[in-house]
Amino acid sequence: RQRQMCIRDSDMDATIFGDPAGQIPRMDTLSFPADEKLVKKAVAANEKANPDIHTFTGRVVSGDQFISDKDVKERISSLFHPMCVEMEGAGIAQAAYLNKVSYVIIRAISDKADNSATMDYPTFEKKAIAHSVRLMKELLPMI
């Protein structure tokens, strides 16, 4: 299922000032939309390079925490309705937005933050590296 790819900051809470959750004060936007052309190219490249894995697009939220607590996961899910939660994308997206630079965030998801992971992290890491290398070899010539 495809949705607009964008990044939001899950840690930012200036709601006491009337801002919505995730709004960075004095920013003129609530989220940082990724470049749609780059998203389409990344999806096409990944589907060709890694047909064995699923590709999803949509809202990504970033925060300065590993999500391992069920209540934190549910709070973030109910506030932001993300496809995934990670730690780095909002900083990259905000810098790209402020400098008017196109960007796309590509993530390999290791777990669902609910103790249901089916492989250990070292195994996941090796697979993610192999998938990432194949993806980049396919994507870079396209951009």
Where are these regions (language model features)?
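His/Asp/Glu-rich mid-to-C-terminal helical/loop segments that flank catalytic regions of hydrolases
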Residues: 113-143
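Active-site rim beta-loop-alpha module in soluble metabolic enzymes
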Residues: 9-84, 95, 99
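Electropositive phosphate-/nucleotide-binding environments in soluble metabolic enzymes
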Residues: 32-40, 70, 86, 90, ...
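Short, small-residue-biased leader/transition segments that mark boundaries at the very start
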Residues: 2-7
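Alpha-helical scaffold segments in soluble metabolic enzymes
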Residues: 41-45, 75, 91, 131-138
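Active-site-adjacent mobile loop/cap segments within catalytic or ligand-binding domains
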Residues: 71, 75-86, 90-125
